[in-house]
Amino acid sequence: VPHKTLNNNLRVSLLECRSAQQIRQKLYAALPAFSDIFPASKDAHILIKPNLNSNMNALTGNTTDLRLLEALLSYLRDQGYRVITIGEGTSSGFHREKINIFSRLCVDKLAKRFNAKLLDLNFAPYTHVGFEYGEKAAVARICTEADFFINLPKLKTHFEAGLSVCLKNMMGTLVGLPNKQKTHRSLFKNILNLNKFVKPHLHIVDGLIAMEGTGPSSGTPVKVDLVLIGTDPYLLDLVCAKIAGFEYKEIPYLMLAKEQGLITQEYLNFVEAFVPKEAIKPFKRPHVNMLVRFVNNPKWQYSFIKIRLSPIMNKLFSLKSFGTFLNATGLRQDVFDTQDLCLQQMCLETASCDNCKKCQAYCPVGLNLPEQLQPLHEQCIGCLYCFLVCPKKAIKIKGDLGFFKEQLKRYDAITRSIT
């Protein structure tokens, strides 16, 4: 569905994309329909906020796909925009352990190709948003002051919120862990409070490889092959819920938005008519054990968080052995490995390669693969997408895999099978 409007104002595009080439081609074709909201000045400051909440490769379904980010940066460059910042405020242990998510996901190398700046929103100058119970939380000021703000979320399930798409992605605009934790005193209301304050001009949803099951970091990837573009985060989240096979009443913050009048019956009618049946791919629902449900019960979750943020608990949570315990019990989804990946070389086992070109379809920077694998091309950013999708395991890595070992253990087989 190239483009439809609600009330001659709210616009939504639904694009089917199966390769890096199609993503770029269809994004270039779709974005002119939104040209009236783009800044007139080519010196306008444009902020892009992807979902980089973890160091997990986008093909696991966790983070924003670099193929989509590259296509967007390319489009903005070709339109003449010169001042671009990619900002993200990674949460929890990655922030605490000082793990550089931009580097681990190769966003730094991609940004360099387009002279885009990187900004860790956890350390940005801030303003304040009002939360429930009279609390104030710090929000990166750039998110309210940029001339044009593009939200670039991932479509994935979330064991607390049901789904994480446009509205939930704004959590990454909060400065530092304590401010992010403030949302949990009344999570669903505060998601809405945050979105009433921080209002991106455009939303581009990565539904290429989404995540189902126990997201946001322990689910499984699911191939959806969709990109959604729109101006209203409530409408887009409704569309994404429909695609994932959820009723809006199953998503607590969407049900609350309906109660507050942020979602009208007209929105619901639009979604029913807009989403084609062939686009609906019912996701597996999040499932957590009794301990996780107990700790995350809204009645006492905030009390647990206050205890968690005490100096003694901070020390305990930083211990590797305690982290292993948290992962084993399901209380923590992410693995905070401080050992970086050191990629020395990638090579092709020519006897195994059948030249299926799948590696080329997933390369964010458009290398002619597998030919340009040997030797490692100077334009390669080391994202390892080609390695992860090769069905014959013909692409080999040399170097210290570091944190990436754990991802391979969990996702190697399923990533190759779905792609």
Regions of interest found by a model, annotated:
Residues 1-356, 361-377, 382, 387, ...:
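N-terminal and secondary-structure boundary signal
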